[in-house]
Amino acid sequence: MPQDNVRIARSLYDHWNERQFDKIAELMAADGEIVLVGSDTHFRGPSGAIEFSQMWADGFPDGRVNIDNVIASGDHVVLQFTGKGTQTGPLKSPTGEIPATGRSITLNLCDIHEIRDGTIRLVQSYFDSASMLMQLGVMPEAAVGAKA
């Protein structure tokens, strides 16, 4: 069972790299959701999975993800992965749209999947949004050694 769940979770990222959003939707349970934990943003059901996937692809048309580590236990699969791309399109964010910057980024991410009966019920996505915003040049670099 855990190996089946690993295969399902991995295929989500393979489909994203190939921009096969219809196949991503097929992996999602009708009542499943993707949650961007840091901003408490929710994408519900297969249509939400497409919206989530398209959001990143619109912002980073050349974007690719590479899975670095996988841990599975029962219904849960944790994937650490690296995303790379150049923001040549607009990127939706919880605070509004970020216009294309033309900058390339490398982002470390971690997703926790809950998979039951062959479908994804929940994806909790964790990433360092401050690092992403600094790499895009829309947030100033943190001052090293600054004191409050």
Model-inferred region functions:
Residues 1-148:
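C-terminal and inter-domain tail/linker signature
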